[in-house]
Amino acid sequence: MKLPGIVTPLIAFVAYAIAQATPNYTSPLDVDIYNPSQLFNVSGPWSLMSRAGNTLYISGIRGFYPSNTTLAPVGRERVLQAFLNMKMLAELGGSDLTSCLRLQVYVTDMYRWRPLVNQVQEELWKDVAPSYPPRTILEVQRLNDDDIVEVEGTFYLGD
């Protein structure tokens, strides 16, 4: 399997981001809100992730390259990049794919994109297969910027 050429610079970028992981805000109920601008900026009034207790919640993530906020090419590469972005945020928040509690995936064409989502998930979780996290995949009429896929996850942080 060949990963996109962006992966090596992305690893260095993630290493920097992990070193900088601090909440942007902590609520009175001790919920940390993260919007790490060193990854990519959100395009609206939401944050990329939050932590409540030992649970990390990652918002819907698309297939942007963090280095330049352009979308990966349509198809498998975009689906993979969306999952890699979620993985990167999980690691930034102190978790990893093996601690994923639940996935929710939105696609604009179930028959076209679900097989690619399955391939990417099998690839990324190959070390723990067949213990995949619970997943809901939904076909939606439209995603932001007419994108094809968006993935969100809930992760366990440990005790």
PLM regions: where:
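N-terminal presequence-like segments and the immediate start of the first folded domain
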Residues: 3-84, 88-93, 98-101, 107-159
